[in-house]
Amino acid sequence: MKENEKVIMEKGIHTDFKENMTYGEYLQLDSLLSSQKRLSDHHDEMLFIVIHQASELWMKLILHELNAAIESIKQDKLQPAFKMLARVSKIQSQIIQSWDILATLTPSEYIEFRDSLGQASGFQSYQYRMIEYALGYKTPHALKIYEKDPELHARLHTALHAPSLYNVAIQALVKEGFPIHKDVLNRDITQPYEEDATVEAAWLEVYADVKKYWNLYQLAEKLIDIEDWLQQWRFRHMKTVERIIGHKMGTGGSSGVSYLKRVLDQRFFPELWNVRTKL
């Protein structure tokens, strides 16, 4: 072996793990890396599985950060929440890039194993549903999808009835003294949020006097960041689906691309977008 080809091993590097935990054990890699089970013999099904599993792991972290941010804002601890929400945006940017990898799957390749999926579909992702709930887009009718698993159904039911990120953001406006209409404060939070003139007026005042309401302004911009990234994710999802299956019906029974295009019109924080026109 030539001198420049020698493997450099520092003396302090640990090599005896008979009584110590290894990297693989800490991350439970045996379990994690044995979860990619193809239902067909097609080579590209592994890509399909890994992309979706990796996205679910990132969504788990998004939920971890969102729920912590919601609790932090409830307790008037906005600065820690800003860090958590900024991290959510970074994770979102990472997930968006995964569509570029999935887009390497051609229609001819996908059709070889698509039937193996049966009725399984990303539409059924319970973590994505919980992210929507955490952001304020509540869809009670969607709970029926998860009745097969009572424990999971109960978790989603709890998430449906929990205050969303936008709920606690509006409460932060109230604590600052903004007059928010009682219908907003007493609304059924299990239903999709509908924009309100008093909420818009409050955010407009925040944006008109940034120095006075700096923390609320920062909070608003963090929310905009998250919705912006989410819409980019939705768009890349729609275009990747169109690229691979065209306008076929989705495996979950949806209209596919047509449904995904309609979803692009859904907004989580409507007043924060409206104030940009009003300023």
Swiss-Prot record:
Obligatory cofactor(s): heme
GO terms of biological process kind: L-tryptophan catabolic process to acetyl-CoA; L-tryptophan catabolic process to kynurenine
Molecular-function GO terms, alphabetical: heme binding; metal ion binding; tryptophan 2,3-dioxygenase activity
InterPro entries, A to Z: Trp/Indoleamine_2_3_dOase-like, Trp_2-3-dOase_bac, Trp_2_3_dOase
Swiss-Prot/TrEMBL catalytic activity: L-tryptophan + O2 = N-formyl-L-kynurenine
Pathway membership: Amino-acid degradation; L-tryptophan degradation via kynurenine pathway; L-kynurenine from L-tryptophan: step 1/2
Residues annotated as binding heme: H237
Pfam family, any one: Trp_dioxygenase
Binding site for substrate: F48, I49, V50, I51, H52, Y110, R114, T251
Enzyme class, first EC level, given as a word: oxidoreductase
EC number: 1.13.11.11
Cofactor note: Binds 1 heme group per subunit.
Keyword annotations: Dioxygenase, Heme, Iron, Metal-binding, Oxidoreductase, Tryptophan catabolism
UniProt similarity note: Belongs to the tryptophan 2,3-dioxygenase family.
Task of the protein: Heme-dependent dioxygenase that catalyzes the oxidative cleavage of the L-tryptophan (L-Trp) pyrrole ring and converts L-tryptophan to N-formyl-L-kynurenine. Catalyzes the oxidative cleavage of the indole moiety.
NCBIfam families in the record: trp_2_3_diox
HAMAP family: T23O
Complex formation: Homotetramer.
Protein name: Tryptophan 2,3-dioxygenase
Source species: Bacillus anthracis
Chain's gene name: kynA
